[in-house]
Amino acid sequence: MKRREFITSSVAGTVGAGLAGGATPAGAGEAGEAVQAATTRKILIAGGGFNTPFIRYMAQLTGKARPKLLFLPTASADSPQGIIAWYRNCAPLNVEASHQISFIASTQQAKGWDEVLLSVDGIVCSGGNTLNQQVIWKAHGIDAILRQAWDRGIVLGGASAGSLCWFEEGTTDSRPKELSTVQCLGFLKGSHCPHYDAEAGRRPLYHKLVGSGQMKPGYACDNDAGIYFEDNTVKRVVATRADADVFHVSLVDGKVVEKKLPAERID
């Protein structure tokens, strides 16, 4: 089978081995506990690099022994390389991995967006062009369905465009010539700056925008570092390397304050 045929035809793929240590977080056992966990709205982001450790952590957050995790590569224009990388990153984990492309035709797509997106335990959004991602989601009503997913306790997440999309606004490379700003879904209040350590222009622009009041205070994440939110509360800061950091950036007495948030290592 050709690679492109594999990508377009493989709406659901199954991979498996095991979550780290076989651990399942509290809330997965008793029926009452599972209901309680489902009412908590969860988002897991990374500044860049939503790879196997982050996917493993998301799987644990679902509270399921073998969760269904779906990749939504809209921002990357349904890149075949990104989809293949998704399955490769899921391969060591005991998850049921799938993906849903956005560039579809009614003759090829039998299920509605809600039937697909609301039937899984976690949704990971790709990096890419955030501006295009937002426009496509709104045109299809995917933005509203993602809100339903969040409200139902389906774990949402991603890196780069896949982290920025959940906030009210943030910095983006989605337009020609220079970094700019983009308005997003607003599930998480405030702003976001991904790739904080990886792209030279990100930090000074973010400081300028927050300092001038053009952008709300928010969270900056290095590549390989991220945040787990329950509702709009930071519950845990994580990283996959020692020098990857997360910061809260705000305006205090007319000055930009960058506060480093201690991160826990995940593997």
Task: Label the model's feature ranges.
Residues 5-27:
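N-terminal export signals
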Residues 47-49, 100-104, 132-136, 196-197:
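Short, flexible loop segments at the rims of nucleotide/cofactor-binding pockets, characterized by
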Residues 125-203:
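Class I SAM-dependent methyltransferase SAM-binding "motif I" and its flanking Rossmann-like core
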Residues 45, 99-100, 124-125, 156-159, ...:
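General beta-strand structural signal in soluble alpha/beta enzymes
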Residues 32-66, 80-92, 122, 170-172, ...:
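C-terminal and late-domain segments of enzyme folds
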